[in-house]
Amino acid sequence: MKESILAVLLYLFEYYFSENADLVRDRDSLQNSLIQVGFSPAEINKAFEWLDALAANRPTLTNPRVNGPVRVLHGPELDKLDVESRGFLLFLEQQGILNTEQRELVLDRAMALDQEELDLDDMKWVVLMVLFNQPGAEAAYAWMETQMFGNEPEQLH
């Protein structure tokens, strides 16, 4: 079975929110649990490195720029992110869900995944994980979580 970093991250993310989250308190215990579930040690280590980089690259809290410069994606980003993913990032930034620093962190974390291409669903998970890790982004995280798990999309005001 070909696992990916994203599969390990999704499992970690979903497990973190389960009632059993208190059972795993340290990295070694969590790694052993992931191995028992069937993930390879190599993919688990890559996922932990991905999370460490996410934690290390928290953007500073700044006011969002209004009508700032437009971010132009370059070759590898265009190759990896499908059109829907790119449009989704633009939408999130235009609606104030992501500021420019958070967008860059999302792009960095998306590019760090070991997949050749990311679709819209993959991008939504990356955004959700980045927002979860951002202090002061609770409202944006809650909105994003509603979009992913709610029955009806919530309107932005």
Curated annotation (Swiss-Prot):
InterPro entries for this protein: Smg
Organism: Xylella fastidiosa (strain Temecula1 / ATCC 700964)
Name of the protein in question: Protein Smg homolog
Underlying gene: smg
Alphabetical list of HAMAP family matching this protein: Smg (MF_00598)
Family: Belongs to the Smg family.
